[in-house]
Amino acid sequence: MANISKSVKLGVFTLAIMNVTAVVSLRGLPAEAEYGLSSAFYYLFAAIVFLIPTSLVAAELAAMFQDKQGGVFRWVGEAYGKKFGFLAIFLQWVESTIWYPTVLTFGAVALAFIGMSDTHDMALASNRYYSLAVVLIIYWLATFISLKGMGWVGKVAKVGGMVGTIIPAGLLMVLAVIYLASGGQSQMNFDGNFFPDFSNFDNLVLASSIFLFYAGMEMGGIHVKDIENPAKNYPKAVFIGAAITVIIFVLGTFALGIIIPEKDINLTQSLLVGFDNYFKYVHASWLSPIIAVALAFGVLAGVLTWVAGPSKGIFAVGKAGYLPPFFQKTNANGVQKNILLIQGLAVTLLSLLFVVMPSVQSFYQILSQLTVLLYLIMYLLMFSGAIYLRYNMKKAPRPFRIGSKGNGLMWLIGGLGFCGSLLAFVLSFIPPSQIAVGSNTVWFAVLIIGCVVVVAAPFIIYASRKPSWVDKDTQFEPFHWEEQATTAQTAASVSGAAKSSASSASTNAAGPVSQSTPPPEQHK
């Protein structure tokens, strides 16, 4: 057994690459290319105040509760109770549901560029009805495949991650180097300011979406026990992974800015246009349809993998009595069919915003902002909960601990993550000046109503719980404060029984006692 255990241990660089693969996506590069050289500042800033804190805090929490299920529900619930734990995992599930239309919009645009006519491709990519049709067809196809429980989906996803993300990212950077080295004129002003113009407040708004680029790093915390000497090596893996991620994002963004003028940058199309322009420059336009297929394949493979994934967490919690039996139904393959169908209905309704918003780009941006807002609420709970547990569960074993002694480093790391998340949360409500989002009323209505409804829903569901919702076959470990209450109650019962026995023995020794004598007082 020792050899088996040892054989599955991850190396520092292996874990770092796993973290990079989980986070890096090229679809967000055009949003930051709008900022030119200062985009590097945003990437570095978000990495310091969000990416690294998320990775380290999640690692400590995951290691603390490695033998207990629930994920973020467990982490937040241990600190603030079941109600807020349910809110956290509900937000995580809904956020992923809203994410699907945005990532599939990018996939639809990629598919539109398979043709050889730039004019036709760009017109098709901008067509709202085309994007709506592609999003719905691909999503429901992915849902159908997930319900079938096909094992080959995982293999497709692994290939898709390499073909649709890593290879295109490297190719984009190589093309930029070739372009500049051969005398190509850069459209990005590298003499500009590294630090953005903070006096222009709405310039920060679009950049707040960069936090979503790094979202999901908390998932890497589950591997904290799979690495040798986690206290020393896990932080190394985090910092190496963060450095590689930032380098890919910065150089990828620069590569787009070099070939596309800032005024022509489009959030959904510019990545494909950038590749098109580079391929024309090196006289290899025939590669454009191939890279479009590769990018689309990467998107579709990711959706196939994750369409059922995030719903598994809410499904497990639901079986513990937090969701009605309707949501606990599975099919013959053991897949949570009703949750997937409800998820699909939500994706369909959200996708209909294509018809309301003035453009595909504005639809993409408003859903991205709503996704950021919901995810950030969960992160605010996670960061503050981690600090709170340092005092509420002082003696709990921490196989991986931020700081060897005291709580100062946790306050620094967790506090940095909390403040960064709070700043991004506030900025995300403001419409970006760089994108025509149509009516500001629609913008604020979608974001505010969306947040209120999604946050209120789990509290309403929690208040409506019934004993019949609990699946008798499920085994969900109690929270530490529930165990303490049970232990205290048991101790009180044992103490009471001991006192009662002692009293009876004393009474018997003294002789018969009147039947009217009251029983010993029970202390709580």
Report the location of each language-model feature.
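Transmembrane helix-boundary motif of multi-pass solute transporters/channels
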Residues: A2-V109, F211-L212, M217-G220, I227, ...
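Membrane-interface loop-to-helix entry segments
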Residues: Y130-S182, A215, V238-A243, S368, ...
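Loop-to-transmembrane helix boundary motifs in multi-pass membrane proteins
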Residues: K6-L15, T97, R128-L136, E228-K232, ...
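C-terminal membrane-solvent junction of multi-pass transporters and transport-like membrane proteins
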Residues: K6, Y130, V156-V159, K329-N333, ...
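TM-loop-TM module centered on a large, flexible mid-protein loop between adjacent transmembrane helices
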Residues: R74-W75, G81, F113-M122, A237-V307, ...
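Hydrophobic transmembrane alpha-helices that form the core helical bundles
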Residues: E34, I52-M64, K68-Y139, T143-L147, ...
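Membrane-interface "cap" regions at the ends of multi-pass membrane proteins
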Residues: M1-A59, F65-Q69, F190-D191, S404, ...
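Helix-loop-helix junctions that connect adjacent transmembrane segments
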Residues: S5-V8, A40-F41, T119-Y130, V159-A292
